[in-house]
């Protein structure tokens, strides 16, 4: 994986406004100054998070891509591998509002979104905001809550607002739901429905650290986020400015066709219950644009698509066969995706 700050290869591409004239370097879509500012913002975030998250540079990179794309993130892994610490490291490196919701079986939807309470003095109902009203929301162990409570996140993840008693209430910007969950075969968990899974831009897995990285963690005795001393290195305004640039990152027609071929191939793949939705295809486009921006480019390459197919599509696909071990489904889906991508010609 290439990281911001690495030298970029010279790339030639077509500008659709030039009648097919081949251009090199940066385009007019994103100004050089704005691109540089966005790159520097995420360089600072990356450096800050790596101080805490040892040996997981690719995971950190995907988290930042998700943030830049304005999406939501689901991290699924065993207890104790750093899911919550990853969320705290992101939140503490930004100057923004943060809240944590511990999902349990007795959590109610109103505990998440808020509730209208009658105010005797005002002689009217007043809306008391829930913890969902923050910029970074850690939905910890989301699959321990009932499906009814999980569904409380559907509207806010899609529309950045919650509706209580028929009245819509907008959440702040930027807004990112960072959800964690234990594997579905753990006792006391409720699998997220497909409609909920589709709201997440990516699903990531952290895994155990390498021996050297784990030894460094043991030496530093950083157990839990309370011991982490971090300072904010980016403001909400800087994040919003970078997010606004993502949609301006250029995607050549041939790269869009390449993306669409991958999407279409998942719909005819016999191993999958159903293929990727239109929302899924748009999610991959948005993530690819964000990755290009973080790497200092204002145009998308096929490599951006290839690197993100797994994190963006993996949780949106399920195996067609009736019975299977849940622990085997993810690698089987990833294997099928790799086969699909490998069979599609890369545009020149």
Feature map (PLM): residue ranges:
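Short, positively charged and aromatic/hydrophobic N-terminal segments
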Residues: 3, 13-16, 21-22
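Pre-Walker A (pre-P-loop) alpha-helix and adjacent loop at the N terminus of AAA/AAA+ ATPase modules
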Residues: 36-73, 78
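C-terminal engagement/docking regions of AAA+ P-loop ATPases
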Residues: 27-29, 268-348
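Walker A/P-loop
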Residues: 68-104
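Conserved alpha-helical scaffold flanking the Walker A/P-loop in AAA+ ATPase domains
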Residues: 62-64, 118-138
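Walker B catalytic acidic pair
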Residues: 140-141, 152
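Conserved beta-strand position immediately N-terminal to the Walker
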Residues: 73, 137, 175
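Canonical AAA+ ATPase core
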Residues: 119-124, 145, 149, 157-248, ...
């Amino acid at each position: 994986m290439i990281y911001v700050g690495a030298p970029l290869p010279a790339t030639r591409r077509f500008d659709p406004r030039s009648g097919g004239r081949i251009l090199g370097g940066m385009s007019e879509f994103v100004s050089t100054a704005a691109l540089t500012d966005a790159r520097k913002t995420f360089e600072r975030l990356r450096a800050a998070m790596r101080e805490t998250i040892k040996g997981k540079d690719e995971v950190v990179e995907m988290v930042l891509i998700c943030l830049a794309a304005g999406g939501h993130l689901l991290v699924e892994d065993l207890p104790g591998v750093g899911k919550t610490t990853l969320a705290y490291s992101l939140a503490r490196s930004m100057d923004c509002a943060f809240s944590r919701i511990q999902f349990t079986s007795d959590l109610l939807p109103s505990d998440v979104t808020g509730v209208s309470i009658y105010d005797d003095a005002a002689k009217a109902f007043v809306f008391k905001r829930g913890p969902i009203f923050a910029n970074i929301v850690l939905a910890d162990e989301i699959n321990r809550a009932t499906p009814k409570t999980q569904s409380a996140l559907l509207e806010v993840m899609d529309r950045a607002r919650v509706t209580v008693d028929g009245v819509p209430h907008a959440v702040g910007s930027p807004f990112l739901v960072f959800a964690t969950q234990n594997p579905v075969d753990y006792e006391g968990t409720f699998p997220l429905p497909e409609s909920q899974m589709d709201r997440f831009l990516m699903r990531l897995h952290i895994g155990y650290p390498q021996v050297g990285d784990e030894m460094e963690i043991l030496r530093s005795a950083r157990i839990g986020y309370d011991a982490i001393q971090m300072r904010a290195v980016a403001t909400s305004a800087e994040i919003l400015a970078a997010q606004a640039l993502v949609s301006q990152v250029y995607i050549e027609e041939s790269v869009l066709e390449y993306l669409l071929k991958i999407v279409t191939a998942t719909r005819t793949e016999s191993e999958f219950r159903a293929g990727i939705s239109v929302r899924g295809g748009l999610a991959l486009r948005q993530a690819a644009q964000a990755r290009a921006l973080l790497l200092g480019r204002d145009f998308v390459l096929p490599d951006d698509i290839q690197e993100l197919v797994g994190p963006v599509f993996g949780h949106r696909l399920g195996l067609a066969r009736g019975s299977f071990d849940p622990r085997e489904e993810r690698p089987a889906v990833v294997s099928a995706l790799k086969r699909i991508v490998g069979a599609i010609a890369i545009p020149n």
